[in-house]
């Protein structure tokens, strides 16, 4: 019987152990997509307690707690921090088999140093007190944890109207060497069907000093904000393409669509597709000219529980996987961006694992001369960010593309404790390659495979995003 979560956790061959301990373990972290609040990094936020750093805002944990019958007041409601933590501690023993069980104990181990102890009601007091004592120390502040975890770069997720003042404050502090750069997330600027669109256009017009009436005005406003983001070091965009649409339109049609929407009219699905296509093609060309990377996160079915959405708002754990076809529309969109050789470096993520092979083969259609891995099939995302999901994504990437050119893992997280997801990924990567070697499916060449592992863990992302590190 193998003990739980030793130093060789998941490393079930000797070759995997060598790969992890000698090549993967000590690689820095290049976390190119996350949802950390830049204000907390700028202020070097000190966490009040374990709930504050670990459970607050974590919809993964809330989903598990609800499934365990926990009352909503103990998830997102007015219960005390300690009551919410105790509810989580009571849920954890029921999460065996869920990635939350592994994540929980990896996060207790690093950075808190808690080993050989499982979170449960019987250990809740001890773990709560031990972690809170550590959180009072200087090296457990927001910046302190990032430094402990050997982070070199993080890309936050930011709206085009954001001032980026916190990024500027961080950049001016020469004592803090981790790059904290904004990522451009313009969903509100092209989700024309949303009820909030008109209000957003007014805000975008205000910050860009542009009166948005025609499509060209929107392009002008977005270009000004792209320049603002570029001035703060941005090299990455991110798009939530819950549904992939494609329909072409001329400028007069786009002007009419925008004008009628700003006048309060409801648009047809075809008109929505025309508008979204035009914005994405325009933005893709801007990214290509600037050398940015675009990310497409495809296939979420959001806000399914309307009663809870009205009570609690979005992003609180009521989203799931969509099953709408997207191959043909995505192909047309990428091909349109590529017509004038203005398709930027692109990472494609799917939420439905059924679409893994779709994206794995789609990325091969648009690779770029002289640019290894220009089109990336991205890491297992959200519900696929677990052992089976990561294994499937990497296996299919290896079979349909080049695993050796993969830009690797990202946290996609709102928590400063989520950096151990990079460790989890690295262990799974080394386990997978070690098994290939054990089965005679890959050569037992530690130098060849060790360099490949180092590249996937850090070097490929550093080179792909072309961000100068400190």
UniProtKB/Swiss-Prot annotation:
One Gene Ontology biological process: D-galacturonate catabolic process
SUPFAM superfamilies assigned: Metallo-dependent hydrolases
What does the record give as EC number?
A: 5.3.1.12
Query: Which pathway is it part of?
Result: Carbohydrate metabolism; pentose and glucuronate interconversion
Name the protein family: Belongs to the metallo-dependent hydrolases superfamily. Uronate isomerase family.
Q: Which residues form a coiled coil?
A: none
> What are the annotated disulfide bridges?
none
Task: Cite the entry's keywords alphabetically.
Answer: Isomerase
Do the record's keywords include Disulfide bond? no
What is the enzyme's class at the highest EC level?
isomerase
Q: Which reaction does it catalyse?
A: D-glucuronate = D-fructuronate; aldehydo-D-galacturonate = keto-D-tagaturonate
Q: Which organism is it from?
A: Escherichia coli O157:H7
Which Pfam family is one of those matched by this entry? UxaC
Q: Which residues constitute the signal peptide according to the record?
A: none
Q: Which GO terms describe its molecular function?
A: glucuronate isomerase activity
What's the protein name?
Answer: Uronate isomerase
């Amino acid at each position: 019987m193998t003990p739980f979560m030793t130093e060789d956790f998941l490393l079930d061959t000797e070759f995997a152990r060598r790969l992890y301990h000698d090549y993967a373990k000590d690689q820095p972290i290049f976390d190119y997509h996350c949802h950390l609040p830049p204000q907390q990094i700028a202020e070097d936020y000190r966490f009040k307690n374990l709930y504050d750093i670990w459970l607050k805002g974590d919809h993964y944990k809330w989903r598990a707690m609800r499934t365990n019958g926990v009352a909503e007041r103990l998830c997102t409601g007015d219960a005390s921090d300690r009551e919410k933590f105790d509810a989580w501690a009571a849920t954890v023993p029921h999460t065996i088999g869920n990635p939350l069980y592994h994540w929980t104990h990896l996060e207790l181990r690093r950075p808190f140093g808690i080993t050989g102890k499982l979170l449960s009601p019987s250990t809740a007091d001890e773990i709560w007190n031990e972690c809170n004592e550590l959180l009072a120390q200087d090296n457990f502040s927001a910046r302190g944890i990032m430094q402990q975890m050997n982070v070199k770069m993080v890309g936050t997720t930011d709206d085009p109207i954001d001032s980026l003042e916190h990024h500027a404050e961080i950049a001016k502090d020469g004592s803090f060497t981790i790059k904290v750069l904004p990522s451009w997330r313009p969903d509100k600027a092209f989700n024309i069907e949303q009820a909030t669109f008109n209000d957003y256009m007014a805000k975008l017009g205000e910050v860009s000093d542009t009166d948005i009436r025609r499509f060209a005005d929107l392009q002008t406003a977005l270009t000004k904000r792209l320049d603002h983001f570029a001035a703060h070091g941005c090299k990455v965009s991110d798009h939530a393409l819950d549904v992939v649409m494609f329909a072409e339109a001329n400028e007069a049609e786009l002007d009419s669509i925008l004008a009628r929407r700003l006048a309060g009219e409801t648009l047809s699905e075809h008109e929505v597709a025309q508008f979204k296509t035009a914005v994405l093609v325009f933005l893709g060309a801007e990214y290509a000219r600037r050398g940015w990377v675009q990310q497409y996160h495809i296939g979420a079915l959001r806000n399914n529980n309307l009663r809870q959405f009205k009570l609690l708002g979005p992003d609180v754990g009521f989203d799931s996987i969509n099953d709408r076809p997207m191959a043909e529309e995505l192909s047309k969109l990428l091909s349109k961006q590529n017509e004038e050789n203005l398709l930027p470096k692109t990472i494609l993520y799917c939420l439905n694992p059924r679409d893994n092979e779709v994206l794995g083969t789609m990325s091969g259609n648009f690779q770029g001369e002289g640019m290894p891995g220009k089109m990336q099939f991205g890491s297992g995302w959200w519900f696929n960010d677990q052992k089976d999901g990561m294994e499937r994504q990497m296996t299919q990437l290896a079979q349909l593309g080049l695993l050796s050119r993969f830009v690797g893992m990202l946290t996609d997280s709102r928590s400063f404790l989520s950096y151990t997801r990079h460790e989890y990924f690295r262990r799974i990567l080394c386990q997978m390659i070690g098994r290939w070697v054990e089965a005679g499916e890959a050569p037992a060449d530690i130098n060849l495979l060790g360099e490949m592992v180092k590249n996937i863990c850090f070097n490929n992302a550093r080179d792909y995003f072309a961000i100068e590190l400190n």
